[in-house]
Amino acid sequence: MSEELMKQLSNYKAQLQQVEAALSIDPDNEDLLKLQKDLQEVIELTKDLLTSQPAEGTTSTKSSETVAPSHSWRVGDHCMATWSQDGQVYEAEIEEIDNENGTAAITFAGYGNAEVMPLHMLKKVEEGRIRDEIDGKPKSKKELQAEQREYKKKKAQKKVQRMKELEQEREDQKSKWQQFNNKAYSKNKKGQVKRSIFASPESVNGKVGVGTCGIADKPMTQYNDTSKYNVRHLMPQ
């Protein structure tokens, strides 16, 4: 999918360059200005899709500064951690610890989602439950799973909607680009219509069917009377 989007993005940029070149000659052309705006929008939408794709299915890493953890964690410990996708706190299990970078690889209990996050961001299970009680009624595992499913569903719907919008933009751009090319072709051909020699002349003196090399409306060439130079003139007297 990303390779296809890259090709389309390159094609949109090439079209935009041609439109901008045409605008440099005719800057007030409304059709060209509209086409330029539409191309810019579809380019931005395609870039957004390309940016969002690599983020899906990958683990998030947050490690800029190493901060001393408030608790001595060990592999297998259960903790409370914030899931990067929705910002909610869930119970997780520590799978691996990187003391050098001060990070831990964790897996959220009941979900199987794995992430890597700083050790100082982890909370003890008791602390997490106390915070839930302060914020409101603690959520059951079933409720948390339902929330996560709903979040994923909304995210998938949003992605499908964006893909539909992009497909519609592609079709619109395809149609507009064809119209633009047809107009340019018609403009180049303007004034090159050939007239038939049998076309009606525009003046009363013109003759139908007489080729005059593009001057059919001019009167026919006049010749002097040569009747005195007849055959008898050549015969001996």
Curated annotation (Swiss-Prot):
Q: Which family does it belong to?
A: Belongs to the SMN family.
Keywords assigned by UniProt? mRNA processing, mRNA splicing, Nucleus, Spliceosome
**Protein role:** Involved in spliceosome assembly.
One Pfam family for this entry, by name?
SMN_Tudor
Question: Per its UniProt record, what PANTHER family does this chain match?
Answer: SURVIVAL OF MOTOR NEURON-RELATED-SPLICING FACTOR 30 (PTHR13681:SF26), SURVIVAL OF MOTOR NEURON-RELATED-SPLICING FACTOR 30-RELATED (PTHR13681)
Please classify the protein's predominant subcellular localization into one broad category: nucleus
Q: Name one GO cellular component term.
A: cytoplasm
User: What residue spans carry the Basic and acidic residues bias annotation?
Assistant: 162-175
* Residue intervals of the Tudor domain: 72-132
What highest taxon heads this organism's lineage?
A: Eukaryota
Mark out the compositionally biased spans (Polar residues). 52-69, 176-185
Return the Basic residues bias intervals.
151-161
Q: What's an example GO BP annotation here?
A: mRNA processing
Give the domain section of the comments.
Answer: The Tudor domain mediates association with dimethylarginines, which are common in snRNP proteins.
Report the residue ranges where the short sequence motif Nuclear localization signal is annotated in this entry: 142-160
| The keyword Signal is assigned to this record | no
> Region Disordered: which residues?
52-73, 149-198
- Identify this protein by name: Survival of motor neuron-related-splicing factor 30
Subunit structure, as described in the record? Associates with spliceosomes.
Location(s), subcellular: Nucleus speckle; Nucleus, Cajal body
Molecular-function GO term, any one = RNA binding
